[in-house]
Amino acid sequence: MSRWGASKRRTVARHAPLTSPTPLGQALTIAGVTATALLVAGGAVVAYFLYDLSASFAEDAVVLQDQTPLPPPEMGPIEGPFDLLVVGTDECEPELVAAIGPRCTGPDSMNELNDVNVLVHVSDDPRRVTVVSFPRDLMTPVPSCTQADGSTTDEIPKLQINTVYRLGGLACVTKTVSNLTQQNIQFAAKVSFGGVVAITSAIGGVEVCIGNDGMRDPFTGIDWPPGPRTIAGFEALQFLRTRHGVGDQSDLARIGNQQQYMSRLVRKLTSEEVLANPATLFRLAATAADNITPTESLADPLRIVQLALAGKDVPLDQIVFVQYPVLEDPYDRNRVVPDHAAAQGLWDALAANRPLQVAGDAGSNGGVIEVAPPETTDPSPSPSTGGTSAPDPVEEPVVLSENITGSTAEQATCSAGNR
């Protein structure tokens, strides 16, 4: 095994390798995960620049259903906890039609899917960030939704989550995820993937880690050796699309790989390399404005500043990426259903604003491996001296179900590469 192999690798529940989405559906992952990381760590980076870009940003703002009106935004961090849903859809943008082919020219070209669904929860005092990724093949109840023409849809007891967008757009996806998670989602953003790949190039790329003996995926054109690799542009697209190159080649394994990218992008966005470069900041802002359709609650640039200020100083070990817990669908081994018991522990911990401890693997279905931290020698304890004050008590974390996989932005993971 390469030195980029696992430091530990627990056995995890293995679901069937889920069917692969279309190339377009795979490609939109770039937008979803990049925009999520941008909103988690880069909100403060881009928010002030959005004043100059606010007209295009708010042009197609979406109204959320059944939402309590928010007070007008004002300078300073937003008060209290909040939830933001990031939805990535596989719309056929004109510049991508030729490259994508039949998906954008055939009978399914008008059926826009929400293949990326990521919930960002920011707690209050102390601030913590929890990023929850939902598998695209998750089967879930869908509530009645209002469509663009004002008509309403019927409730659906069980539907694949990535088909909800075409029923009622961003508002319907938000309502569905809100019902599933018991979270009051005040803000949401629909993300187009056209041009978002440029984010990694604009910041000089993101360094990821390829584990085991390297990564090979003929479907995305990857044939990379093990070790660190800085990816930007098309290589970032290849990395985030790959399913056959990681873990058990399932979409669940791919989520862990995407979370590695998000974690490393968060660290890049909060580094001085980005924060001290005005040209880079403006390029990031312009890309975000061009590729995000917000809800009306998020369309005011001052509101974005409020959200950004609330989360800008969260320590990396308090930014946690998790996969929503699932079980194999007993009626279809290529689909998954919610593990409500495991999820309830997560929602209870968020409601109580408790720190989280992920007991499961760093990624589902063997998608990533955690890199062993460097060995250090603890210094000998200093002799006790009288009159010293007691250290601040450390809050005990909530240990999540082992069926919840994930890691913090402080942890280092590598892709569990296949060759």
Task: Indicate residue ranges for each PLM-predicted region.
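Non-catalytic, solvent-exposed segments at the cell envelope interface
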Residues: 2-419
